Amino acid sequence: MIEAEWWEYDSVDEMADAVAGDVGFIIESAIDARDASLLALPGGKTPLPVFSKLAAQKLAWKKVTIVPTDERLVEVSDERSNARLLAQSFMRAGARVIPIGGENADVEAAGNIADARLQDLPWPPDLVWLGMGGDGHTASIFTGPDMQNALDAPKARRAVGVQIGRAHV
C-alpha cells in the first residue's frame, strides 16, 4: 500500500525549493547508479518555479534526458507545446529534451511516434511527474472517444494518442 504524505508550504518559493531539491536528489541518485537519468515532466505554468530552481542546480545535466508526460498536437515551436516549455527550462543547463510526437496532427500517428520515441529510452523513468490542470485534469487524461482504447492498450505501450472530448488549451 502506498502511504500518502501531505506537505504544506508558506510560499510558492519555499515549495519550489523543496521540490527542486527532491528532484535534484533523484537525478543525482540515478546518475550515481546508472550514469544517466530519465525524467518525464509536465508542462503548464504550475511547475515553472520548480523548473527554474532545478535548472539552476549544479547537476550532471548532460546525463539527463527529459520527456513530456503528455503533449498537445502542436508543433514543438508552438508556445503551447510542453516539449518547448521543457526545452526552454532545461536545455541551457545541458539536459536533452525529447519531443514525443505532438507535431503530427493525426492522433493515432502522434501516439505511435510517441511510443516509438519512448521505446528507445531506458525504462522505467527515474521520475514521472504528472501535472494537474486548473480544470482538474491530470496529464491530459480526459474522458473522450478514445478513453477506453487508451485504457485497453497493450501493457508494452509507453504512449497512446487520444482525441479528447473537448478542447483543453
Residue ranges and their predicted role:
Residues 1-39:
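N-terminal glycine-/serine-/threonine-rich phosphate-binding loop
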Residues 127, 134-166:
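Class I SAM-dependent methyltransferase SAM-binding "motif I" and its flanking Rossmann-like core
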